[in-house]
Amino acid sequence: MSIRNGMPAADLPEVTWRKSRRSGPQGGNCVEVARLADGQVAVRNSRHRDGPALVFTAAEWAAFVGGARDGDFDQE
């Protein structure tokens, strides 16, 4: 199966979705991530679990996480 950006999250083979421990128990507005077998990272909306998944390379995901950690996206 070819993994592509925007494909239905339900079509991703054998993935374990995770969300932040800071997410509330009701779920609803959470982002979930899954590491794919080839090292890419898929991201989906927990409200629409069968909806589209965004797929990032490991380098793209590392850059995003690093930017978030460093405050690059903080509003001033």
Predicted regions and their residues:
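Residue-level signal for pocket-adjacent positions within structured domains
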Residues: 7, 12, 49-51, 68
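A short, structured beta-strand/loop element
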Residues: 20-59, 63
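N-terminal first-folded block
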Residues: 1-30
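Boundary-flanking segments of nucleic-acid-binding domains in nuclear regulatory proteins
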Residues: 4, 36-37, 48, 72-76
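Mixed-charge, Lys/Arg-enriched low-complexity segments
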Residues: 56-76
